[in-house]
Amino acid sequence: MAGRFGATVVIDRPIEEVFAFLADGENDPKFSSRVLEIAKQTDGPPGVGTVYASTVKDAGMKTKREFKLTEFEVPSKIRWAEISKNLVTAPEGGYDLAPAGDGTSVAFFNVLEGHGPGALIAGLALRSARKGADAFAQAIKAAVEAS
């Protein structure tokens, strides 16, 4: 079972500033409490092909994750795909940014997919993610505005 969740928030910062913050995956722990650590694995600035490796904690379990940036259109679009193999993965996710007055509208989404026994828990993970999507968007807003 695969499913999508997401939310939209307006951030009181210019689009270029918001894009730069979100493009740096090492900022993820500033707004995602599940990300315990993360590091860029490739050289150079973030862009298509950049890989981030992280340790996350979901439902009390720590797992290693790797994501690759698949689309990178400054300052409006970032897409990624999880390249690690776990019970539940995010084969696609992203941010869409657009000017909103003096600020920036950010829409984020992730697709969750279960594999093997993970198919049994993917629905539960998706329901939880959908329930927390608006709070996650607010956490992104708070982190960007505090930076």
Give short role names for the model-derived ranges:
Residues 7-9, 65-71, 82, 91-99:
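Hydrophobic/aromatic beta-strand elements that line small-molecule binding cavities or substrate pockets
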Residues 1-43, 47:
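Hydrophobic ligand-binding cavity/cleft-lining segments
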Residues 2, 62, 88-90:
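Short solvent-exposed loop/turn micro-motifs enriched in small/polar/acidic residues
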Residues 39-86, 105, 135-147:
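Glycine-rich portal/gate segments that line the openings of hydrophobic small-molecule binding cavities
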Residues 83-135:
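Beta-strand/loop substructures that line and gate deep hydrophobic ligand-binding cavities in soluble
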Residues 9, 54-56, 80, 95, ...:
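Preference for bulky hydrophobic residues occupying beta-strand positions
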